[in-house]
Amino acid sequence: MESNGVPMITLSSGIRMPALGMGTAETMVKGTEREKLAFLKAIEVGYRHFDTAAAYQSEECLGEAIAEALQLGLIKSRDELFITSKLWCADAHADLVLPALQNSLRNLKLEYLDLYLIHHPVSLKPGKFVNEIPKDHILPMDYKTVWAAMEECQTLGFTRAIGVSNFSCKKLQELMAAAKIPPVVNQVEMSPTLHQKNLREYCKANNIMITAHSVLGAIGAPWGSNAVMDSKVLHQIAVARGKSVAQVSMRWVYQQGASLVVKSFNEGRMKENLKIFDWELTAEDMEKISEIPQSRTSSADFLLSPTGPFKTEEEFWDEKD
């Protein structure tokens, strides 16, 4: 199924995923009618891939929008959609993975997910989601048993595929050493200001699809940056191509062989973001983008602890690898 010209990517497990999805993180209108209407509008204009998570607190609104889209005839079947959600760190324990997924399904009013991701490579003491995580709650993840529980979720049919998010090459190696079903996706920050070249090469060699988040700098998030949208290089390319800076950034990610999720509640920008697949950046454009200074926008500070598995950003991201 293609919608509004969005290509389908075949993951290593054989299932197909729209190359572009709508993100649902960090909305300022969580749990409101406006949030539901934004998701409904996204379906109406052509989005078929939605990326949510237990921690985003957007699952229930997305579920309501899906139900309404079916009632309105915007889609004929839930099978037309590709729904991704994520396992929160406090549930990243072998005995809590399946209950957490089942809770997400209840929130979404769905019988299955298309993709379920481990949100971060770290666990927390079990409990409800909190914005301020006590440092003594941060624990190392038992990759072997947690991933085995993820595999069980797929085997039981509650999700069609499983993957990870915010994993470095080193952490992927640790997880895959004991995996019976390899992860099909690693969702990470990637943009013209964070190329992730080494990670992309590793994932490609291991048949793991990169899904890029924060493609436009995560503007509006507490850790957001204007580096992408203010880039003179990207502005020059955008003017030359008759495109927006956002479209250039998204197109660059796609031309690197990655899929992506982006978020907008503005109908005009929703439509604009879909229009990145019928044109290409030139080799000269790509060369210019390759020279843009690199910096990470995402911060792992909230998951760092003197007594936890990761004490510094460098340890969390394995930046020195």
Swiss-Prot record:
It is an enzyme of class 1 (oxidoreductase). Keywords: Alkaloid metabolism, Cytoplasm, NADP, Oxidoreductase. One of its GO terms (molecular function) is codeinone reductase (NADPH) activity. It catalyses: codeine + NADP(+) = codeinone + NADPH + H(+); neopine + NADP(+) = neopinone + NADPH + H(+); morphine + NADP(+) = morphinone + NADPH + H(+); neomorphine + NADP(+) = neomorphinone + NADPH + H(+). Optimum temperature is 28 degrees Celsius for reduction (forward reaction) and 30 degrees Celsius for reduction (reverse reaction). InterPro entries: AKR, AKR4A/B, Aldo/ket_reductase_CS, NADP_OxRdtase_dom, NADP_OxRdtase_dom_sf. Changing residue 25 to V: Increased neopine production and slightly enhanced velocity for forward reaction. Slightly enhanced velocity for reversed reaction. The keyword Cytoplasm applies. Optimum pH is 6.8 for reduction (forward reaction) and 9.0 for oxidation (reverse reaction). CDD domains: AKR_AKR4A_4B. SUPFAM superfamilies: NAD(P)-linked oxidoreductase. GO terms for cellular component: cytosol. The active site is at 56 (proton donor), 119 (proton donor). It is found in: Cytoplasm, Cytosol. Pathway: Alkaloid biosynthesis; morphine biosynthesis. Latex secreting cells (laticifer cells). Expressed constitutively in all organs with highest levels in capsules. Restricted to the parietal region of sieve elements adjacent or proximal to laticifers in roots, stems, leaves and carpels. Substrate binds at residue 119. Useful marker for the forensic DNA analysis of opium poppy. Belongs to the aldo/keto reductase family. This is NADPH-dependent codeinone reductase 1-4. The gene is COR1.4.
